[in-house]
């Protein structure tokens, strides 16, 4: 029999769970600031060409060695709950910048720390935090507008390689390989980075449309040496439904025989007498035919079949449109220059669909990607479809002597890939923090327009913050940051900055030291947004720590195997 729980034990349990700790005003902000500084110190050592690596203990396997800011930020958890709260908010800055731009997380962390530090000082001195925030937001908008006017569009393969090299911490091999991949698959092509199985990095490019479904039966193989089906100029029958009846494929087989062209059937499935007829025709040598299952599931399958139809100039046979494969005509069948099918995947090359229809389909997919309601997963799938239609797919297989080396190099490849995409999308600026230093000159106008003293301090907060990334890059190279930042500021030419690798002043864009505009913009917006909100915090609430020696949580009375059963 189960004993009834006492009310007092339930009260104790609830009270235990609801115990919180609070800190107000200056005390709360000081604790948050300490956490922000701890995280920023760890992340900022990786900044610039002479930045250092960070070694991170992993729960499983070998330790991870990395120079990727967001990886370092995510690895940090602090013991003091209030400090950890500050660190978590700065992690949010790095994560947001990583999601939106894919790079620039270390710079965003340095900016966030600087804005928050200055704001905390000003609030402690009696400034209105809301006015400080208004001033800093106005300054950020002015800086972005200035950078927008001075950015340079990226056009050549050399410039793409330069962007990738900078983001890969000066590794020219990574830059060249990514530029090569982008040249082959186009700006919208999919480039994926995977861990390879050799010592060298490899680039594998698939042009045309590739999907992960192979032949239904090995009887269709035309090249026994390679185990592949290879067709030249085939007809393509596309069906949304399963094909079982011989009547469904008879017209298509006859058309294939008459035109002396191979036939590729892509359907939900092909079985029964339809599959038997296909195999029999193939074995007798009457018709070259192959059946493949359509890729994906549900709506994704429907969309992919639609894409293949647009690419090949065919029609998808579907019950919705009341067109059946048993009535197929030559106009309804698609065609392609060549098709290669293995047991795992199918590649269609040189589809003969209309270029206008193809461009319209790509535009439709782009508009869905741009829609705010589209989820990240859907965007990823749409981006893949767009790549297959417009360019191709490139896979970079990262090689190395050990798991740790491959993991570190893969991080740099992904950073470089994101930075390159951002540069191609929105243009480039002189790198090494140079563009932000030049932007400080326009903040005098913004300061004059500020309606009160506190807003002017907000503008000054941004003015001080945007010099910090360059200062940190220079200091990581062992130079005197403040002196060199002053010299960059005095230099009238927008592109003139300091090359920390060589220790000389130079035209940054000509030297290939560049930052994507999107990365700089998103880093500044994310950092100022979170940091100025942090400064307006008046109360911080955390779960109170457990007293030493007490159990983590009292067991709920009357649970199976616990006291209360008899």
From Swiss-Prot:
Localisation: Mitochondrion
| GO molecular function per UniProt | ATP binding; ATP-dependent protein folding chaperone; protein-folding chaperone binding
The annotated region (Disordered) lies at 546-566
GO CC annotation terms, alphabetical: mitochondrial inner membrane; mitochondrial intermembrane space; mitochondrial matrix; post-mRNA release spliceosomal complex
Sorted UniProt keywords: ATP-binding, Chaperone, Mitochondrion, Nucleotide-binding, Stress response, Transit peptide
Chief location category: mitochondrion
GO biological processes? cellular response to heat; mitochondrial unfolded protein response; mitochondrion organization; protein folding; protein import into mitochondrial intermembrane space; protein refolding
InterPro entries recorded: Chaperonin_Cpn60_CS, Cpn60/GroEL, Cpn60/GroEL/TCP-1, GroEL-like_apical_dom_sf, GROEL-like_equatorial_sf, TCP-1-like_intermed_sf
UniProt similarity note = Belongs to the chaperonin (HSP60) family.
This protein's name: Heat shock protein 60, mitochondrial
Native source organism of the sequence: Candida albicans (strain SC5314 / ATCC MYA-2876) (Yeast)
Q: What is the lineage of its organism?
A: Eukaryota, Fungi, Dikarya, Ascomycota, Saccharomycotina
């Amino acid at each position: 029999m189960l004993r009834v729980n006492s009310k007092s034990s339930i009260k104790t349990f609830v009270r235990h769970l609801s115990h919180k700790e609070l800190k107000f005003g200056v005390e709360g902000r000081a604790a948050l600031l300490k956490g922000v500084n701890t995280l920023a110190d760890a992340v900022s050592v990786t900044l610039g060409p002479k930045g250092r690596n960070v070694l991170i203990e992993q729960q499983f396997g070998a330790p991870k060695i990395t120079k990727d800011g967001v990886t370092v930020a995510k690895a940090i958890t602090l013991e003091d709950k209030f400090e950890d709260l500050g660190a978590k908010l700065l992690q949010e800055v790095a994560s947001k910048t990583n999601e939106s731009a894919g790079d620039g997380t270390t710079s965003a962390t340095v900016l966030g720390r600087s804005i928050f530090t200055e704001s905390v000082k000003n609030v402690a001195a009696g400034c209105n935090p809301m006015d400080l925030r208004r001033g800093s937001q106005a300054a950020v908008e002015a800086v972005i507008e200035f950078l927008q006017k001075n950015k340079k569009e990226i056009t050549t393969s050399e410039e793409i390689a330069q962007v990738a090299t900078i983001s890969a911490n000066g590794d020219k091999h990574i830059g060249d390989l990514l530029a090569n991949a982008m040249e082959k698959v186009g700006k919208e092509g999919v480039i994926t980075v995977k861990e390879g199985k050799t010592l060298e990095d490899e680039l594998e490019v698939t042009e045309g449309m590739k999907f992960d479904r192979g032949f239904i039966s090995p009887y269709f193989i035309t090249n026994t040496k390679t185990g592949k089906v290879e067709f030249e100029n085939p007809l393509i029958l596309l069906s949304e439904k399963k094909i079982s009846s011989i009547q469904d494929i008879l017209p298509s087989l006859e058309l294939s025989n008459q035109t002396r062209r191979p036939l590729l059937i892509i359907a939900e499935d092909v079985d029964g007498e339809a599959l038997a007829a296909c195999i029999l025709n193939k074995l007798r040598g009457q018709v070259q035919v192959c059946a493949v299952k359509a890729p994906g599931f549900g709506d994704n399958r429907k969309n992919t079949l639609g894409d293949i139809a647009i690419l090949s100039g065919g029609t998808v046979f579907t019950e919705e449109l009341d067109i059946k494969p048993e009535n197929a005509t030559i106009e309804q069948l698609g065609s392609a220059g060549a098709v290669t099918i293995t047991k795992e995947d199918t590649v269609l090359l040189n589809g003969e669909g209309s270029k206008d229809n193809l461009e319209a389909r790509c535009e439709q997919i782009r508009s869905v990607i741009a829609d705010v309601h589209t989820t990240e997963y859907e965007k990823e799938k749409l981006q893949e479809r767009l790549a297959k239609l417009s360019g191709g797919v490139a896979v970079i297989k990262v090689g190395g002597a050990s798991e740790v080396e491959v993991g570190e190099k893969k991080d740099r490849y992904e950073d470089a890939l994101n930075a390159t995409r951002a540069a191609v999308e929105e243009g480039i600026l002189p790198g090494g923090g140079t563009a932000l230093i030049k932007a400080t000159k326009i903040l005098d106008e913004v300061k004059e327009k500020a309606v009160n003293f506190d807003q002017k301090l907000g503008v000054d907060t941004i003015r001080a913050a945007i010099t910090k990334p360059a200062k940190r890059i220079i200091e990581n190279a062992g130079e005197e940051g403040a002196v060199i930042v002053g010299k960059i500021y005095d230099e009238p030419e927008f592109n003139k900055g300091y090359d920390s690798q060589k220790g000389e002043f130079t035209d940054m864009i000509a030297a290939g030291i560049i930052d994507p505009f999107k990365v700089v913009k998103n880093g500044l917006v994310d950092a100022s947004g979170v940091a100025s909100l942090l400064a307006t915090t008046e109360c911080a609430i955390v779960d109170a720590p457990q007293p030493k020696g007490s159990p983590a949580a009292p067991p709920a009375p009357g649970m199976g195997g616990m006291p209360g059963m008899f």
